[in-house]
Amino acid sequence: LELLCGPVPSVRRRAYRIAGVHCLVGRALHDMTEYTDAEMHFRRARAMEPYLCMHMDIYSLVLFQLHREVALSALAQDLLAMDPRSAMAHIAAGNTWSLQHQHDAAYQCFRQATLVAPECAYAYTLAGYEALELEQPARAVRLFLCARRCDRRHWNALAGLGQVYLRQGYELRASEAYAQAFLINRHNAVLLDLLGWTLEQAGDADGALAVYQRAIDMQPKAAMTRLKKAQLLLATVRAADDLRLSPRECT
C-alpha cells in the first residue's frame, strides 16, 4: 500500500492496470476494516478480469460485511458457474447463506471448501464462526485451530477463538487471543475494540479504557468504541462516587 500510495505517479498508474494489484490492495483494506474502499478495488479487478477467481473469497467477505446481498449472491453464482468445485465458490456461497442467517447451509458450504482445499485457512475459520452461531463451541474451537495449523499468521482464527472463550467466560484466554490477533494485524481497530471489551468484562477498567482509546485514535469514526469508552468512564466515576459516599453511610 505504501508503494502504491507513494510519490511516483508512473508506478501507481502501471500497478493499477493489473487486476491482481487491485485484489491485493482490496485484501489489505479488508484487513483494516476499510470495506467500502476494498469493494471498489475488487470491483475494478473483476471489471479488468471477469473470470478472476483468486482472492474472491476476500471479496465475498467484503460484500458480507457491507450487507451487499444481491452483489454477494451474484458473485457466488458467477464463481460456481466458472468452477463449481473451487473453494472460492463455496466460500462465496457460504457467505451468501450466512448473510441470510441460514447458518447450517453456510456451515456446509464452508466445510465443502475445506474438503476441496484443505490448505485454505479461511474456509476453516468461516466454518468455525458458523459452528459458533449453531451453538457448537467445541467444534468451533477445533476448526479455528485447524485454520491456525494452515496459517500461523491467520489472525481471524485467533479472533474466533477469542469470541469462543469470551462466551464461555474465560476472559483471560479471550484477551490473550485478541492480543495475539492484534500483534499480527496492527491496523485493525475492531480487534482493539474486542480486546477492550474483554478487558472490561474481566474487571480491568484501566486497561480497557487505554485499549479503547488506542482503537479510537486508529479509527476516529468508531462510534461503538466511543460509546463503550464513555459508558465505562461513567461507570468508573459512579463507582468512585459510591466509594467516597460509603464511609458517610456507615456513620
Feature map (PLM): residue ranges:
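Alpha-solenoid helical-repeat scaffolds
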Residues: 1-108, 112
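Structural signature of tandem alpha-helical TPR/SEL1-like repeats
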Residues: 2, 32-41, 66-78, 99-112, ...
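Eukaryotic, compositionally biased intrinsically disordered regions
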Residues: 76, 82, 86-87, 96-98, ...
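Helix-start (N-cap) detector for alpha-helical repeat units in TPR-like alpha-solenoids
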Residues: 19-20, 52-54, 87-88, 121-122, ...
